[in-house]
Curated annotation (Swiss-Prot):
It holds the Pfam family TPR_16. This is Tetratricopeptide repeat protein 27. Gene3D superfamilies: Tetratricopeptide repeat domain. Belongs to the TTC27 family. The keyword Repeat applies. TPR repeats lie at residues 454-487, 493-526, 528-561, 562-595, 597-629, 630-663. The gene is TTC27. Disulfide bonds: none annotated. It comes from the Eukaryota. Keywords: Repeat, TPR repeat.
Amino acid sequence: MLALERSLLRGFLSAAESQEWKQGEISATESGSVLQLIFDGKYEAIFSNSTIRNVFSASSVAEEDIESYLEKQILMYLDCSTEVDNMERQRLMFLLGVGSLQLFVQSNWTGPPVHLQLQGFLPSALLQKCLEPKMLHATILKMLVLDAESVYTLTSHPILLLIARVVLVNSRHKLSSLQTLPWWTLRCVNIHQQLLEERSPELFTLAQMCIRQMTEAEALFAGDEGWHLAVQFNLECAYTFLYYYEYKKAKQCFCTAKDIAKLQINLTGALGKRTRFQEKYVAQLILDVQRSEEFIPPHSELTPAPTPLENLTMNCDLNDDTVLNEIKLADADQYQVPDLCAEELAVILGICIDFQKNNPIHKLTEEELLAFTSCLLSQPKFWAIQTSALLLRTKLEKGSTRRMERAMKQTQALADQFEDVNTSVSERMKIFYCCQVPPHWAIQRQLASLLFELGCTSSALQIYEELEMWEDAVICYERAGQHGKAEEILRRELEKKETPVLYCLLGDVLKDHQCYDKAWELSRHRSARAQRSKGLLHLRNREFRECVECFERSVQINPMQLGVWFSLGCAYIALEGYEGAAKAFQRCVTLEPDNAEAWNNLSTAYIRLKQKIKAFRTLQEALKCNYEHWQIWENYLLTSTDVGEFSEAIKAYHRLMDLREKYKDTQVLAILVRAVVDGMADRTGEAASGLKGKLRELLGRVTSRVTNDGEIWRLYARLYGNGHSDSSEDIEKSLQCLTKAHKCEIQSNDWEKDVSSFKEVAKGAIEIAHVAIKCSKKKSNNQEALQILSSARLNLRGLSSKAKQRFVDVGSHEICNEVTDEVTTMDNLIAELQELSNQLRDQG
């Protein structure tokens, strides 16, 4: 049976397997006929099978809900006496679960639409409890609610997922003979999660257990025959981890899949043209894909055969009068991508999605992702990969004026393909679970979003209302300034049926706590959304204590709400509850390790808690996520300086100057200069004096941008020894810096009037004179030495005469006592400088 289970996971039988299957015993059984229907993509026909109909039929229906009834009937069928019969029954129920899941995927993801009547296989007595179809639909949806997270209301044929869940989740303890059951349970979990408003901790726990169980099933992946499934399993695990914020585990799985596939995937540059009128070839970013060690995927018959091009979604041309449809390379043969199989293409798509999740939104990132999509679209072979690549490209192109029209057309084509009956579901299901194709309503939602951005508000609203995506419709109305209309449609829907979500949306529109309280009561105190929305309103009104209470209740119900943890942390900081803030932001970065702002805020909490080393480390993580955020760099600069990471502080200062041309922090520079000059120990115990060269380079850059700050010039002079160095170059540099500092200080008019300010200026001039004397003595050229002495003398003479004019006692006509010492020192230095000048002239 393991061989057939492998084939079922792949979705098809190879020619050899098909021959073997026809000759085997299982093909003649009930489970064999159902398995054949699944291979043929005739999932609806499963529900016409007499045995399966008998499982669902009962002479009497007790007072129970549909889920309980289904579970009871399936377990009754499985609880039989003979071992041989039991194996067959396990197989049949397992295939019922798989077939139901596949049909549910067809009904909501791939198309074409499914026309299944519940009356055909469920007893009428069970269905009569719900008087009308809408009521029955709502009842089934309610059974799929997990962790109080609502299910998308227009989910098509939810009974199919319910059956799949009853078999693959609730009854899995009775299906012990099926080795691949955990993998199908994982697929069921991933599909179920995509219907829910938020991530479900219950589903994630189940997914982790399934992954663990399948990882231990070594026989399934052994040898060349297991190669295809090993790649697929790692990709499916990666997408699961990615969705639940487990980015490191996701990356490991993507890398494992790439290593098994023996692919080398690198972004590189190649000469090419992008526009029709471009004359010269210039460097273009492309994806270079090669197989390592001339590897050829084993057993080509075990990989899906490519779908005919006419059955794939059309790749719309750009039709621009300037930009080419694709890059025209100067040497296309040099970067020829090998003919890739389904698993290899899925690996490239996975690496692309991982790259997207782990890099900040930036123009360069967009170009890199477009290189991935171009590579994938150059080999159109599989519906799921083509759809995923085209969807990603439309998201990347919607911001470009030259590409917006194609993005619009392409999204429309992707939305329309669901109704297309020309491509069989078997073709669409190839490699489906390795690609994370969104459900068809998510594609329509993307189309509506594009329409709204283009200004087609009424068309966007029409789609949102047809999809019953009331939150998007409300946002649309609010942005269009039609607040009354937003309230009107919500009240209209509430008249039809009161739900916690609708009351939450009404609360958002009216900014009314009563609406959230009503939602909370309706949900029987299980709606994380109600408490989240109520908390956000308190936050907006700066009612931080009440806001914290609401957010705490919300994350207690569903701890996988990234945004709520972040807002909770902000509220705690406002209340100066730094321990609570640290805990909240720690949960944020655990859920999303590349959330730069959360890392930054976590460091703020640690600083307030006097845990500076932790703050330093968290800021390092923040910068890995966002290298362009100047406020994070500033926090990093201050924290690095504070903890003695002087080398990092210098690096941070340079980066801040990259981001903000005239950035200045004199206090930090003063600490760094003192650390280097005094040889202070850094955090590792090393003397900071070793950073003298790097700090001189930094101050050189700072003074080239900020030329009018005397204090910075003085720090620069101090770094060169303030004239006390043995090096003539250092003494001269000190003199230059001190002179520039002095010029900055005398640019202000106030220093001449105020005694203390004058004394500071005089002190600076005296220091310049002393350094000038030292510098002149180091000069071999007498003319240069004379110039230095003359400049210092003239400066002192000007200050001395100013003092004698401004700071004179009216009665005695003598200089004020407060400046007597400075004037005497200056006069003595003037005489000394004159004497030295005379000596130099005599030597000349």
